[in-house]
Amino acid sequence: MLLSTFNKNVHSFDSLESFGDKEIGILASSMKENCQSKQFFLNLKKNKQYPQFGSIKDWEKFCLKLEDTKSNVKNLITKNIRIFKNNNPAGLITGYYQPIIKVSLIRNKEYKYPILRKNKIYDLKTRAFIDKNYKNDDIILWTDDYINLFFLQIQGSGIGIFEDGEKIKIAYEGNNNLPYKSIGKVLIQQNKLNPKEVDLFTIKFWLRDNQKEAYSIMKQNRRYIFFKIEESNTSMRPRGALGLELKPNFSIAIDKNIYPIGIPFIIEYVKSGKRKLAISHDTGSAIKGYNRADLFTGNSSDSEKIAGRLKKKNFL
C-alpha cells in the first residue's frame, strides 16, 4: 500500500519493485485527478486513521509538485510516496465490471422489469417489497431479464443498449439501506453449489437452470440498487465514489472504513508473488477488511470473464 508520509518505519517507493512507465503514467494521471477533487481531501480528513495516510498539507504539497512536473514523474513519486505493508492476514481480490443490458423506454411483453431511480419511500424496504410495490414515476428504463437486472445491481453501474443499437450510461444513484447478502454464499449453504466452483458464471448458470427457485434465492439479497441516466459525451465508463471515471484494470474498490478513497496501492498476489499498481477509486458493501479489494475490469467483451473468474489471495 502506498501512502504519503515520511515515517521512518516505511519503505521508499522503489524498494519493493520498479514498475513500468505505463503503470507509473496511469498512477500519475489518476493522482492528478485526485488532486482536483474536493471529495478526495474530504475523505482523507474524515478517515478514522487520519493522518496515517498523509495529512492534507502533505497531499497539497505533493499535488503542487505533481502539477509542476513535466517529466520524470517516476522520480517525483519515488521521493514523495512511501510504501507500508500492513501485518493483517491475506485478503481476497475479486473483480467487477460494467455490464451491458438490453433496455427500452416503454414496457411491453419482453421488456417488463423496471430499472428504478432512488426514492426515499424505498428506504429499509426489501427487494421483494420493492419489486411488487414500485412507483411508475420512479421507472427510468425497462429491461428484459431480471437476472441481468440483478447483476446490474451487483455491479453498481452499466450500459443500456436499445434495440436500434443506441447506448445509454446507467449510473449508480443509491440503495435501500439494507445490508448486502451474497447469493453465492446462500447457494453454498443450501448445498446447491460446490464452494470450490462458485463464481459469477456458475451462479448465473444455476439461476438460469433453476428458474422456479431463482427468485427465492435472489430476494435473499435484500439490498436494492437504484440508478440514474448519466449524460456521456465521450466515455461510457462508470464513475467511482470520488465522482471520477474508473480506469480498467487499475481502479479498485476498498473498505472505506479503513482507507480513505483515492490513495494508491500495490496489490501483492500471495501465490505468484506478482505485484501491480492500483488506485482506490471506489467502495462496496461486500468489500470489508485490510486486504480486501475489488478490481474494476472495464466494459469490453473480456471484462465480465476476467471479473467473474478473479478470486485470489492478496495483500495491499
Residue ranges and their predicted role:
Residues 2-316:
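Solvent-exposed, well-ordered loop and adjacent helix/strand elements within mature globular domains
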